[in-house]
UniProtKB/Swiss-Prot annotation:
HAMAP family: PS_decarb_PSD_A (MF_00664)
Protein name: Phosphatidylserine decarboxylase proenzyme
Main location (coarse class): membrane
Marked site: Cleavage (non-hydrolytic): G189, S190
Residues carrying Pyruvic acid (Ser): S190
Organism of derivation: Rhodopseudomonas palustris (strain ATCC BAA-98 / CGA009)
Keyword Lipid biosynthesis in record: yes
Amino acid sequence: MSIVNSVRAQIPPIHREGYPFVGGFALVTLILFWIWSPLGWIGTVLTIWCAYFFRNPARTTPVRDGLVVSPADGRVSMVVDIIPPPELGLGAKPLPRVSIFMSVFNCHVNRSPVAGRIERIVYSPGKFINAELDKASEDNERNSMVLSTEHGQIGVIQIAGLIARRIVSFVREGQPLVAGERFGLIRFGSRLDVYLPEGTKPLVAEGQTAIAGETILADLKGGDAGRTYRTD
């Protein structure tokens, strides 16, 4: 393997949503160097951080019917049974919910937790309070998606936070997704909620680190059947 290919294998590409930001930071950095070199070095650090924030690494997703994988990198902040927001259309009974908080240092590309078809997408304007607070799921700006699978419906909500002010979705209603497929992105810190079918037992705990497309949140079929893996 050449040195160039080796470097490419170690450094993930930048997501296209990050191009304007990284380019803008780089331009400002050049201006800062022209004004005063110490400012330019500060700009260089910020440009590198921006490129790091918008990284788009490949992930190896376990592929088996019934597995629910994490839609986001971050920390599992809540595992509770709670009534889902009405826009999901999942009823008024409490359902298992796994919440994953993404800091500004996590990769913010979001991935489908299951293989299924997008039944519903609803954008809800709102506030920008701390995404770690429980009420953020109802008060904050959010983009809600319902995935239909053979084992029931899965609700996925992208929630904006104090710093995150832009939710990006790459998908549309009726579109099929495979587990681990990229479906969106949230800029600069936020939260992802996953609502599981009634009676599902989450396989993660609060405080655990989750990796998008890889960490298994739940098994809708149960058991320990074999699985294959897909890298994307």
